[in-house]
Regions:
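Charge-dense, helix-prone N-terminal extensions
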Residues: 2-161
Length: 161
């Protein structure tokens, strides 16, 4: 016999066990001291600056997840079930990923000449999967943040003035 469960119960169980879109959400969000220890002081400041730049232009839901097999943590910016970008952290390294769909790749080509050669090279070297081109940047400073904001604007118009 199949037992039908109320939707409220199912949502509660999903939240309780921490599954969100296939990701494993963290029960304990890493503290500033944990992140500083993991990244080092200078990279933690870069992480904070990148988050501030995104937060300044976008009102998004932020989700902490495990970082999978290659990273310690993932910090995802989402709205309406769609991911804008994800930040990743592991020992002395930051990752910043944007996934470009087919239409977004066309928009990238339209602004390519306004972007740095470093950003364009990283884009060109990224693999294309069935759901898009997965571009991973590893910022060590804030030099390319203006370029990153242009890339995010391809994905979604800023919703903060």
């Amino acid at each position: 016999m199949i037992k039908v469960l109320p939707v409220k119960f199912i949502i509660y169980r999903i939240e309780q066990i921490g599954i969100c879109g296939g990701d494993i959400m963290l029960e304990n969000i890493p503290s500033q001291s944990i992140m500083t220890e993991l990244l080092g002081q200078s990279l933690y400041e870069v992480w904070q600056a990148l988050c501030s730049s995104i937060d300044e232009k976008y009102d998004m839901e932020q989700l902490w997840n495990t970082g999978g097999k290659n990273w310690t943590y993932e910090y995802k910016y989402r709205r309406g079930g769609k991911t804008l970008c994800s930040l990743y952290a592991k020992s002395n390294c930051i990752g910043f990923m944007i996934i470009f769909g087919k239409d977004e790749r066309t928009k990238f080509e339209a602004i390519r000449n306004t972007l740095s050669t470093v950003v364009c090279r990283q884009y060109d070297e990224a693999k294309i999967y069935r759901d898009g081109k997965w571009v991973m940047f590893e910022p060590a400073n804030t030099a390319d943040f203006d370029n990153y904001m242009k890339l995010l604007a391809i994905k979604r118009k800023p919703n903060r003035k």
